[in-house]
Amino acid sequence: MTEHIEHPQWYLYILRTITGALYTGITTDVSRRLNQHQTGKGAKALRGKGELTLVFHCLAGDRSNALKLEYRIKQLSKNQKERLVQDQPQTLCISDTMY
């Protein structure tokens, strides 16, 4: 008998710092991760950056897909990321033409 193992859903998220910089990451719990970043327990790149605002998040599938999607988004220019934030698509696919 085989057991069905439930794998968590992953999300891609983008945060904006008070200086307008955008930070992209992945997580299984967006609220928890935002709280970690805001309390200095998240990415070192965001420590001391002041208030953070969640400006975008979407379902990214499994961890492997989320990592690939995160890489693709991090390769975008700031203007392309801003367009993504403005458009607020519900889902993103690795194969999609990126902004």
Curated annotation (Swiss-Prot):
Question: Which InterPro entries does the entry link to?
Answer: GIY-YIG_endonuc, GIY-YIG_endonuc_sf, UPF0213_domain, UPF0213_GIY-YIG_endonuc
Query: Which protein are we looking at?
Result: UPF0213 protein PC1_0597
GIY-YIG domain boundaries? 8-83
Organism of derivation:
Pectobacterium carotovorum subsp. carotovorum (strain PC1)
Q: Give any Pfam family that matches.
A: GIY-YIG
What is the similarity comment for this entry? Answer: Belongs to the UPF0213 family.
